[in-house]
Amino acid sequence: MKISTNESSTTAYAPIHPDYQFINPATLREEDEICFIRAQNCCVCYVDIVDSTITTSSINNPEKVRKYYEIFLNTMAAIARNFGAKIIKNVGDCLIFCYPRTSDPSNKSAFNDVLECCITMIDARNTINQKMHEEELPSLSYRISADYGRVEVARSATSESDDLFGPIMNMCSKINSKAPTNGIAIGDGLYKILQSFSSFSSLEDNCYHFEEIITPEG
């Protein structure tokens, strides 16, 4: 231990406890914390609350804050599972999930489920906010982003749950903020596949409006 002052420097040595054991890093056994299992193509979705930090900062009761996130995340997870999605994780107020059946890009039914799931989530906002009001909590809005591409599937040594890595995850996260409030942003990979499906064309012909969003590189 070294004690320094403006006027002088003094070095003092503390006694070492007799039970203390020095650890030689060379003797440590190296184990992989993250193991990459496989790579596959699939559709990935992010659903994220808009301005949740500002909203929850005005809620003084911690139990109310927990209920706020609980209602949103559990409702979104239930809808996602109903359409065949697998929940990957939540990061704060953002729920991340994927659709394993979309690994086959010709499976129109699987991609139709992706569309129906996202639309159902948007339509569920009134129901979610009704639950919020019953708990005397403020209303919320959210954004959904979805994209399709190659992901690396990994598993932690301390967890049995899969995690996903890769550029498509980064892109899906990036375009989420570009989605309109209570709307959906679709990445280029997913858009190209959906364009060939009649179900997507019928959406464009009806009440849903699609427009290109330019995202900066980097």
What do these predicted ranges mean?
Residues 68-72, 117, 121, 171:
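Hydrophobic alpha-helical membrane-association signature
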Residues 54, 153, 193:
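Conserved protein kinase catalytic core
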Residues 30-113:
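Catalytic NTP-binding/metal-coordinating core of nucleotidyl cyclase/transferase enzymes
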Residues 73, 77, 119-122, 126-129, ...:
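Structural signal for well-ordered, non-membrane alpha-helices
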Residues 83-110, 128-167:
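Catalytic core of nucleotidyl cyclases, primarily class III adenylyl/guanylyl cyclases
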Residues 147, 167-192:
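Catalytic/regulatory signature loops of cyclic-dinucleotide turnover enzymes
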Residues 1-30, 160, 181-218:
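Intrinsically disordered, glycine/charged-rich C-terminal tails and inter-domain linkers
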